[in-house]
Every structure is written in structure tokens, then in C-alpha cells.
Regions:
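Acidic, divalent-metal-binding catalytic cores of TOPRIM
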Residues: 1-200
Length: 200
């Protein structure tokens, strides 16, 4: 996606484009990424966190208990993503052990400036084409509708990722899908990372 952003001019010009700089990609689930932020802050290196919105809502289970169920973003009440919850609590000055519910609209309306803390920046899915996916796969499908044979009247349910594993989906993008589009939240995050210009 970095190369696709560079080729299409998303980053503008610079002496050291992102693809010419050293960077490491580390895959950590949204439940644990925030645990590494103090270490990143200690190192003082730029860190981009691309994570899933993971919208959920309270539902009654078969046993009669209230449980959090994964739902489309328009029906979401909050997120199950611990890193996003940690980030919001930090921005609001709340203790890490705070368990109050964070409304999904607070998350989806987070101002750009609130997505950066020191050398760390967080991005997650945003609305595009009138819809918002709650995962990378749904976001890519949303902005690459032609490739996935999805029309203009696509619903959030149509974007739902089914079938292949997340790894297979990503490898298909790299190896088989030259015409996919990069979701706005990824462009935004990679632009932030590119603008850190560590070498200049």
C-alpha cells in the first residue's frame, strides 16, 4: 500500500520517500497493541497503529445474558478494540482501569489531532462512499467495489468479509489484485508516517 500511495502522489514529494526509509511492520492484535506504546515512547521512534474499528453492540445471548456482538458500524454502540479504548481513555485523562462504555460516535468523530500522541499515531476505518467497514477487509471492499463486483447500492452487510482468512485476503491484494484502492484511513496514517521524515 505504501508503493500504491507513492505512485498515486498521496505523499507529495520529498528527498526520502517512505519506501526508501527503514521501517518495521509488526502485526499485533488490537487487544495488545497499546501495551507496546510505552516502549515505543521510550525508543522515541515514530509508530503508526493501523487497527480495526471492531464495532459491537449489546445483544441478549441464548442463555439470557447480555453479550457484546460484532455488528456493522451503523448499528454499533462501542468498540471491542482495547487499543482504541486505551487511546480514548488517555485522551480524556481517564485511568487505564476505567470500564465506562465509550460510545462509538466518540471514536468515529475523533479529531485528527487526537489521533497523535507524541511519536504514536492511530488510524482506524472511516466512512467512505457513504459506508464504514469495521475491518481492513471491509474497508478495502468498500473502496474497491468494482473489483469485488459491488454496486453503488451496496450496504454494510454486502461489505462483510466472508470466506478466506485475513492472511489470504492480504496476499490476494499483494499478488492478484492490481486494481484495488487504498482506504482513506490507511492513506492518512501512511501520510503521517511519511511526514515524520526521520532521515531529514
Amino acid at each position: 500500500m505504501i508503493e500504491k500511495c507513492e505512485v498515486t502522489g498521496v505523499f507529495g514529494s520529498g528527498k526520502y520517500p517512505l519506501s526508501a526509509q527503514y521501517y518495521a511492520l509488526i502485526e499485533i492484535g488490537g487487544a495488545y497493541a497499546h501495551k507496546f506504546i510505552p516502549f515505543i515512547e521510550f525508543l522515541g521512534v515514530p509508530c503508526l497503529i493501523l487497527t480495526d474499528l471492531d464495532s459491537v453492540a449489546d445483544r441478549i445471548s441464548k442463555s439470557g445474558k447480555v453479550v457484546k456482538k460484532s455488528v456493522v458500524v451503523s448499528q454499533g454502540e462501542t468498540t471491542s478494540n482495547e487499543t482504541i479504548k486505551w487511546w480514548i481513555r488517555r485522551n480524556k485523562g481517564l485511568p487505564e482501569n476505567d470500564t465506562s462504555k465509550i460510545d462509538l460516535t466518540v471514536i468515529t468523530s475523533m479529531p485528527p489531532d487526537d489521533k497523535t500522541r507524541g511519536k504514536c499515531h492511530i488510524e482506524f476505518q472511516t466512512a467512505e462512499n457513504g459506508l464504514c467497514g469495521h475491518s481492513l477487509e471491509e474497508a478495502v471492499r468498500n473502496v474497491s467495489r468494482k473489483h469485488y463486483d459491488l454496486g453503488d447500492s451496496t450496504s454494510e452487510e454486502d461489505l462483510e468479509f466472508k470466506g478466506k482468512s485475513k492472511t489470504d485476503f492480504a496476499l490476494d491484494l499483494i499478488c492478484e489484485c492490481a486494481d484495488y484502492c487504498v482506504p482513506a484511513y490507511i492513506k492518512s496514517g501512511l501520510t503521517w508516517l511519511n511526514n515524520q521524515r526521520v532521515l531529514e
